[in-house]
Amino acid sequence: MPTFKLVLSDPMSGKARQFEIKDPLAQRFIGLKIGDELDGVILKDLIELPKGAKIRITGGSGIEGAPMHPGVPGPVKKYILADGPPGYWPPKKGMKKKKLVRGNTISDSIVQINAVIVYPKDYTGPPAIPLGAKELEKEKKAEEAPAQ
């Protein structure tokens, strides 16, 4: 019985929201790979997405905290010699390090799934994850400042 934390990012507002996903919805994520897209209708109980919106899987992390790596096939956990992200940010150019990563496929040992909302091309409505009160206040002040 898998349980995931889905971190859903909204490119229109720049905000992210975290959801807890349990069975039977969690079963639909098993076997998906980084870059796969799902129809946004499957999250209708958690968040209201615009018609035609999709969800693209961008990554995740395992129970031990190892990030999913798009270059490692399958639902495995292995060490790679990393020279850059994801999973390792070298302090100097050319440095490499042996790092533990997860494969690019979601399994029941994945705890967190990162995803982004993909809006239809003709969508012009408000963002699915709205701006918070602080951001709205900043926008309001920015609009008033040039008028003075």
From Swiss-Prot:
GO terms for biological process: translation. InterPro entries: Ribosomal_eS6, Ribosomal_eS6_arc, Ribosomal_eS6_CS. The keyword Ribosomal protein applies. Pfam families: Ribosomal_S6e. PROSITE patterns: RIBOSOMAL_S6E. GO terms for molecular function: structural constituent of ribosome. GO terms for cellular component: ribonucleoprotein complex; ribosome. Keywords: Ribonucleoprotein, Ribosomal protein. Belongs to the eukaryotic ribosomal protein eS6 family. This is Small ribosomal subunit protein eS6. It comes from Pyrobaculum aerophilum (strain ATCC 51768 / DSM 7523 / JCM 9630 / CIP 104966 / NBRC 100827 / IM2). The gene is rps6e.
